[in-house]
Amino acid sequence: MMKYRRKKKPKVCKLCQSKIDYVDYKDVKLLREFLTEKEKIIPRRVTGNCAKHQRMVKIAIKRARQMALLPYVKY
């Protein structure tokens, strides 16, 4: 029996849709959307971010962690 693959809908970058040019490390509410329950960064293929915004999110999360706005890990 062959299993049929379901066509996946292409994901759209949330940040491009809302026309955000810069991701600020102080915007903790936005950054938490891109973290798992254990505070790990969610990959681009899951979130649907474009490469440019994924890099900005990654850098902003790392800066926020250094400034103690976000935790490194949660157990």
From Swiss-Prot:
Source organism: Thermosipho melanesiensis (strain DSM 12029 / CIP 104789 / BI429)
User: Could you tell me the Gene Ontology terms of the biological process aspect for this record?
Assistant: translation
A molecular function (GO) term? structural constituent of ribosome
What are the disulfide bonds?
A: none
Q: Name one GO cellular component term.
A: cytosolic small ribosomal subunit
Quaternary structure, per UniProt, is: Part of the 30S ribosomal subunit. Forms a tight heterodimer with protein bS6.
Write out the entry's keywords from A to Z: Ribonucleoprotein, Ribosomal protein, RNA-binding, rRNA-binding
The keyword DNA repair is assigned to this record: no
Q: Does the keyword Lipoprotein apply?
A: no
InterPro entries, per database record: Ribosomal_bS18, Ribosomal_bS18_sf
According to UniProt, the name of this protein is Small ribosomal subunit protein bS18
HAMAP family with a match to the protein in the record: Ribosomal_bS18
Q: Which is a Pfam family this sequence falls into?
A: Ribosomal_S18
Q: What family is it from? A: Belongs to the bacterial ribosomal protein bS18 family.
The role this protein plays is: Binds as a heterodimer with protein bS6 to the central domain of the 16S rRNA, where it helps stabilize the platform of the 30S subunit.
